[in-house]
């Protein structure tokens, strides 16, 4: 890693930490936390909007990486297992992109940065939900697109609660909740998620 790259990463980590707590914190504070001069932050990112875009790009890459990793949904999964895998896989990076979506919207950066982060996740959920409704695994009270949007909003709310410290979860509780929202009976949802926890390496959670 070059010195410039290492400096950029250090600035991003400081910004992620500080902006996540206070979206209005000064760039001078970010610079101080990263151990660089304020002009160095401007040199790398051009200003606050550029810094937020840098964070969003990094989060988008983390989401893409998670969705292509060993714990991600695979074609052979039944819809309920696929949705559980999806939630559990994204939970570790979800806290990051939830904060950044809020920042991007607050900065008025438009829909593109938000879609960069959520686009791959939305596409995955849309396919899972459509298949789940076709097979009778998920309810059909609302159209697939509406159910997918409801699941997204539900999970972002759970992530907000986790960031605020109102509850703690490693993604398993969130996976159960998502399955229930989709129409899976609570006891079955718990068994699906619990099975993944019990099977260990190579199982539902891809560990």
Predicted regions and their residues:
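Short hydrophobic/aromatic patch on the recognition helix
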Residues: 35-45
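Amphipathic alpha-helical packing segments from all-alpha helical-bundle domains
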Residues: 64, 110-160
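Short linear capping/connector segments at secondary-structure termini
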Residues: 69, 102-111, 194-195
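Hydrophobic alpha-helical connector segments
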Residues: 54, 61, 65-97, 109-113, ...
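Helical hydrophobic small-molecule/effector-binding pocket
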Residues: 77-105, 115-130, 184-188
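C-terminal peripheral helix-coil segments that are non-catalytic and often amphipathic
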Residues: 127-134, 160, 164-207
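Alpha-helical DNA-contacting segments of helix-turn-helix folds
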Residues: 45, 49-59
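Basic, helix-initiating cap at the start of DNA-binding domains
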Residues: 1-33, 49-53
């Amino acid at each position: 890693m070059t010195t410039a790259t290492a400096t950029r990463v250090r600035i991003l980590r400081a910004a992620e930490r500080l902006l996540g707590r206070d979206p209005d914190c000064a760039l001078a504070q970010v610079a101080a936390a990263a151990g660089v001069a304020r002009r160095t932050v401007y040199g790398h990112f051009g200003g606050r909007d550029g810094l937020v875009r840098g964070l969003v790009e990094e989060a988008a890459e983390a989401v893409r990486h998670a969705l292509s990793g060993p714990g991600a949904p695979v074609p052979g999964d039944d819809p309920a297992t696929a949705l559980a895998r999806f939630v559990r896989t994204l939970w570790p990076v979800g806290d990051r992109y939830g904060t950044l979506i809020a920042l991007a919207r607050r900065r008025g950066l438009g829909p593109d940065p938000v879609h960069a982060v959520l686009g791959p996740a939305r596409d995955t959920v849309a396919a899972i939900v459509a298949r789940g409704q076709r097979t009778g695994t998920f309810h059909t009270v609302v159209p697939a697109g509406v159910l997918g949007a409801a699941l997204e909003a539900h999970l972002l709310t759970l992530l907000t609660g986790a960031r605020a410290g109102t509850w703690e979860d490693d993604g398993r509780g969130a996976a159960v909740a998502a399955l229930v929202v989709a129409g899976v009976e609570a006891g079955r949802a718990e068994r699906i998620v619990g099975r993944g926890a019990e099977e260990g390496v190579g199982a539902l959670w891809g560990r």
